């Protein structure tokens, strides 16, 4: 966790200042989450970054514990929560392995799983923290099926950036790899949503087996 935390601490200012790339798709994700969540839900978000999603969903649930490995990211989240007057989001430093035990009605992991070296281990920890029948929603970068510019960058450009400390670990997952890993962890997939256009991210909505 230490190496990853250092990278994201360095990236926090730039990350916080960067606009959301596809605002319409992001708003659609938030709308979907509001349909799935209930006012009495307790929620765990892993890899919350600067807390944008947790704060956007706070009014739809009872309580959110928003976690990240980066203290710098979390500090920005706390500042945003204070500015917004949001009191039901608790920001804590942790990864999946040492996240609060719960169990939670819902666990969220947006733009995270492809950045975890031991994804199977992380998913097992997520399952432990999800109530039986509870919700697990992830949005994950999956490799494009065709050799487009994104595919070539990941194959050729990303390793160079990683070598000089400008990019984190990145798993080259196919959609079938992702779905199989989530199922193996004890979840039943109820819906998948592929992002529109050239956005290679896949949303998986799953429930933990009773």
Regions found by a protein language model. Give the residues of each.
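A short SAM/SAH-binding and catalytic strip from SAM-dependent methyltransferases
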Residues: 106-119
């Amino acid at each position: 966790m230490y190496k990853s935390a250092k990278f994201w601490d360095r990236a926090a200012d730039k990350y916080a200042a960067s606009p959301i790339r596809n605002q319409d798709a992001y708003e659609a994700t938030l709308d979907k989450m509001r349909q799935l969540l209930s006012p009495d839900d307790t929620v765990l978000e892993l890899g919350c970054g600067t807390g944008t999603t947790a704060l956007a969903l706070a009014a739809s649930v009872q309580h959110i514990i928003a976690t990240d490995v980066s203290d710098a990211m979390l500090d920005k989240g706390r500042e945003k929560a204070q500015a917004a007057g949001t009191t039901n989001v608790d920001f804590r430093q942790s990864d999946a392995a040492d996240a609060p035990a719960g169990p939670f009605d819902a666990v969220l992991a947006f733009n995270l799983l492809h950045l975890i070296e031991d994804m199977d281990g992380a998913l097992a920890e997520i399952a432990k923290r999800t109530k039986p029948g509870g919700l697990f929603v992830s949005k994950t970068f999956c490799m494009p099926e065709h050799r487009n510019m994104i595919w070539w960058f990941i194959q050729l450009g990303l390793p160079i950036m990683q070598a000089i400390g400008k990019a984190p670990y990145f798993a080259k997952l196919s959609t079938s790899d992702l779905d199989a890993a989530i199922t193996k962890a004890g979840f039943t997939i109820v819906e998948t949503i592929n992002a529109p256009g050239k956005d290679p991210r896949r949303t998986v909505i799953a429930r933990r087996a009773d």
